[in-house]
Amino acid sequence: MAAFDTIDDLPADSRVLVRLDLNSPIEDGKPQDNRRFERHAETVRELADAGHRVVLMAHQGRPGRDDFTSLSGHADILADHVGRDVAFVADTFGDEALDAIDALGAGEVLLLENTRMCDDELPEADPEEKAETEFVQTLAPQFDAYVNDAYSAAHRKHASLVGFPLVLPAYAGRVMETEYEANTAIATREFDGPVTMVVGGTKATDVIGVMDALDDRVDRFLLGGVAGELFLRAAGHPVGHDLEGTDLFDEQWEENRELIESVLDERGDAIRLATDLAYEGPDGDRAEVAVDDIDEKTDGYLDVGSETIAAYEPPIHESDAVFVKGALGVFEDERFADGTVGVLEAIAETDCFSVVGGGDTSRAIEMYGLDEDDFSHVSIAGGAYIRALTGEPLPAVEVLEAAAGRQ
């Protein structure tokens, strides 16, 4: 069991500051509904139904990226899931936010603006330093308690995650509670047969380090997505495409090149790379090319190819456990969902312990009608889930544990 207090311990009639993780895919400037809203709505609804005055914090994207937007649209989606109004204020801790907080009645819910629009939020720092920021020092006196429900961001040392538990009684929400217990159990479980990890997605930096750290737990890695392209480049293939209109791929390559080459050198026999990739052909249909036939860097490889999918299925079927972090392609486009869906279907039909992690991958399960019950656990966490596999500490969990019993 976790060593932190939960919302079961929250005093009645509290004004609570609740940290969620509503970070979502953005299409045409609008957030897309996903399981994070559904899961966090359970915590918000429970708090509001109990008569607490509920003020929510969350983030979306990072400054400078296309998905860095206001949370105004998130409030509408969350309200649909909670089943009651969720007011929104385009401010984090200024006068407008403080006035809206002060006016909040019992059972009412308010969402503050994107925490990453606050200068105090993003730079990673120790909790003691974050607790002294103007952001925390201004907001904290307005509340009786702090609730962290953002397990998927628990590996970050951001002000909204690690600062408030040092100055307020702190509790875990339902998502934090259930994800922590599930992922802790995963990290300590032993398996009799082969353990396979499917690695994809666009955020490769955290995963590459974990691949190195999981050397003694994972027997084979099946790669796709950006991580797969990074390893293909290390193997001498001219691949790698721009992400979200930026040079994020090249940034991840430069940041991780030495580690990638080291992992490939030491664990090359355990790492399966794509042998073909899919892209949009001249007629707009899905087209595929063998990796060995790629002779120059081309933007736009959007999925692993059919040969790769077929090659990934047997090791999955032979596994005692399969962990998934990230999608193998741009599954939001049906033309490039084959890799992600094919691997998930192979896992679902295998009698093994299986965990699917990451908000995008769990969204694929919903989009393509897969049965969540066919997997041992479906986590909305990405980076935190990966770190839990290695037993690495999660800063936001550590401060909750340190705050236990403080009321």
UniProtKB/Swiss-Prot annotation:
ATP binds at E332, G358, G359, D360, T361. Its EC number is 2.7.2.3. The keyword Transferase applies. One of its GO terms (cellular component) is cytosol. Pfam families: PGK. InterPro entries: Phosphoglycerate_kinase, Phosphoglycerate_kinase_CS, Phosphoglycerate_kinase_N, Phosphoglycerate_kinase_sf. Substrate binds at D21, L22, N23, R36, H59, Q60, G61, R62, R116, R156. GO terms for molecular function: ADP binding; ATP binding; phosphoglycerate kinase activity. Its main location: cytoplasm. It is found in: Cytoplasm. The keyword Kinase applies. It comes from the Archaea. It catalyses: (2R)-3-phosphoglycerate + ATP = (2R)-3-phospho-glyceroyl phosphate + ADP. Keywords: ATP-binding, Cytoplasm, Glycolysis, Kinase, Nucleotide-binding, Transferase. GO terms for biological process: gluconeogenesis; glycolytic process. Pathway: Carbohydrate degradation; glycolysis; pyruvate from D-glyceraldehyde 3-phosphate: step 2/5. Monomer. Belongs to the phosphoglycerate kinase family. This is Phosphoglycerate kinase. It comes from Halorubrum lacusprofundi (strain ATCC 49239 / DSM 5036 / JCM 8891 / ACAM 34).
